[in-house]
Protein backbone atom coordinates (compact mmCIF):
# COMPACT_ATOMS: atom_id res chain seq x y z
CA UNK A 1 0.00 0.00 0.00
CA UNK A 2 1.48 3.34 -1.01
CA UNK A 3 1.56 6.45 1.18
CA UNK A 4 -1.51 8.02 -0.45
CA UNK A 5 -3.57 4.89 0.25
CA UNK A 6 -2.42 4.82 3.87
CA UNK A 7 -3.33 8.51 4.23
CA UNK A 8 -6.84 7.84 2.99
CA UNK A 9 -7.37 4.63 4.95
CA UNK A 10 -6.11 5.96 8.29
CA UNK A 11 -6.90 9.68 7.88
CA UNK A 12 -3.28 10.58 8.57
CA UNK A 13 -1.03 13.10 6.84
CA UNK A 14 1.98 12.14 4.76
CA UNK A 15 3.98 14.49 6.99
CA UNK A 16 3.04 12.42 10.05
CA UNK A 17 3.91 9.16 8.30
CA UNK A 18 7.30 10.54 7.31
CA UNK A 19 7.83 11.82 10.86
CA UNK A 20 7.08 8.36 12.29
CA UNK A 21 9.59 6.94 9.83
CA UNK A 22 12.20 9.58 10.73
CA UNK A 23 11.73 8.80 14.43
CA UNK A 24 12.28 5.09 13.77
CA UNK A 25 8.76 3.99 14.63
CA UNK A 26 8.04 2.48 11.21
CA UNK A 27 10.24 1.32 8.35
CA UNK A 28 8.13 0.90 5.21
CA UNK A 29 9.61 -1.06 2.33
CA UNK A 30 11.01 1.10 -0.47
CA UNK A 31 10.56 -0.13 -4.03
CA UNK A 32 13.12 0.28 -6.81
CA UNK A 33 11.81 3.81 -7.47
CA UNK A 34 12.13 4.80 -3.81
CA UNK A 35 8.38 4.83 -3.16
CA UNK A 36 7.26 3.78 0.29
CA UNK A 37 5.14 0.63 0.43
CA UNK A 38 3.35 -0.20 3.66
CA UNK A 39 2.48 -3.76 4.65
CA UNK A 40 -0.55 -4.77 6.69
CA UNK A 41 1.81 -5.12 9.65
CA UNK A 42 2.93 -1.51 9.10
CA UNK A 43 -0.72 -0.41 8.99
CA UNK A 44 -1.47 -2.12 12.32
CA UNK A 45 1.66 -0.58 13.84
CA UNK A 46 0.62 2.89 12.63
CA UNK A 47 -2.83 2.39 14.15
CA UNK A 48 -1.24 1.55 17.51
CA UNK A 49 1.05 4.58 17.25
CA UNK A 50 -1.91 6.83 16.42
CA UNK A 51 -3.85 5.54 19.45
CA UNK A 52 -0.90 6.12 21.76
CA UNK A 53 -0.29 9.61 20.37
CA UNK A 54 -4.00 10.42 20.77
CA UNK A 55 -3.64 9.79 24.49
CA UNK A 56 -0.38 11.79 24.60
CA UNK A 57 2.07 8.95 25.09
CA UNK A 58 5.55 10.33 24.24
CA UNK A 59 7.34 9.10 21.12
CA UNK A 60 10.18 7.65 23.21
CA UNK A 61 7.73 5.50 25.19
CA UNK A 62 6.13 4.33 21.94
CA UNK A 63 9.59 3.37 20.66
CA UNK A 64 10.17 1.34 23.81
CA UNK A 65 6.88 -0.51 23.28
CA UNK A 66 7.62 -1.23 19.62
CA UNK A 67 11.15 -2.42 20.46
CA UNK A 68 9.80 -4.66 23.26
CA UNK A 69 11.79 -2.81 25.93
CA UNK A 70 8.58 -2.34 27.94
CA UNK A 71 5.11 -3.77 27.63
CA UNK A 72 2.13 -1.91 26.26
CA UNK A 73 0.42 -2.51 29.61
CA UNK A 74 3.31 -1.00 31.61
CA UNK A 75 3.32 2.17 29.52
CA UNK A 76 -0.45 2.54 29.77
CA UNK A 77 -0.41 2.06 33.54
CA UNK A 78 2.35 4.65 33.89
CA UNK A 79 0.48 7.02 31.61
CA UNK A 80 -2.73 6.57 33.62
CA UNK A 81 -0.83 7.47 36.80
CA UNK A 82 0.51 10.64 35.14
CA UNK A 83 -2.98 11.59 33.93
CA UNK A 84 -4.45 11.01 37.39
CA UNK A 85 -1.74 13.19 38.94
CA UNK A 86 -2.48 15.92 36.40
CA UNK A 87 -6.22 15.67 37.14
CA UNK A 88 -5.57 16.03 40.87
CA UNK A 89 -3.38 19.05 40.24
CA UNK A 90 -5.98 20.70 38.02
CA UNK A 91 -8.74 20.00 40.55
CA UNK A 92 -6.63 21.62 43.27
CA UNK A 93 -6.07 24.69 41.08
CA UNK A 94 -9.78 24.88 40.24
CA UNK A 95 -10.70 24.65 43.90
CA UNK A 96 -8.39 27.53 44.81
CA UNK A 97 -9.21 29.90 41.98
What function would you assign to each model-found segment?
Residues 1-60:
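Basic helix-turn-helix/winged-helix DNA-binding cores
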Residues 31, 50, 55, 61-97:
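Short, charged amphipathic alpha-helical surface segments
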Amino acid sequence: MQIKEVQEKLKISSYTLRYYEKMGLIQPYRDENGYRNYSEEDIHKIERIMFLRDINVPIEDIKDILNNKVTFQDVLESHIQKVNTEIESLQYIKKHV
